[in-house]
């Protein structure tokens, strides 16, 4: 929402806060519906993997550009550690969806005035992308439920943003379809690191 780029003094602090909340709600609803549509298509076999040569660094840079304003609303800095290029053969739309969900979640569950670190590297024939936040983290009980289709897991971000858990299931599904895997580590009260891998281009 372009109006949120204006200083709060220009439109008044109360109106600015209302617009910020409306913007966040709209983005959350759109993200949920988008994930739901893709998940449904994937589960009924209507979503095929279209392999093409991709630079993961380019994909991640593009997603970060989109989320910088959202992160700025919570005074969160997104920092990257990356090589110049990381070539893979994968479905670009699926890859973008995975990166978008992981960065969105990191911002959602980060504390204000903190940093989200996005790290890219080549390791054992795989391109590995890790997204680390310094936020609320996930307790052990929640970790057991995460990434399982037979258990419902939802939680709230540091500004009470709702998380359905569907986005991570979709990420896992898309990563596996592209020959990789998704994993995470988390500690309650300290934050989480979500990582995924896809095969490097041969």
Regions found by a protein language model. Give the residues of each.
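Conserved catalytic submotifs in the C-terminal HATPase_c
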Residues: 16, 50-55, 72, 77-86
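Short alpha-helical segment of the dimerization/phosphotransfer core of two-component systems
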Residues: 22-29
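Helix-loop junction within the histidine kinase core
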Residues: 40-51
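A conserved beta-strand-to-alpha-helix junction within the catalytic ATP-binding
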Residues: 50-65, 96
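Short helix N-cap motif at coil->helix boundaries in the Bergerat
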Residues: 56, 137-148
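Short helix-loop "hinge" at the ATP-lid/N-box region of the Bergerat-fold HATPase_c
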Residues: 106-107
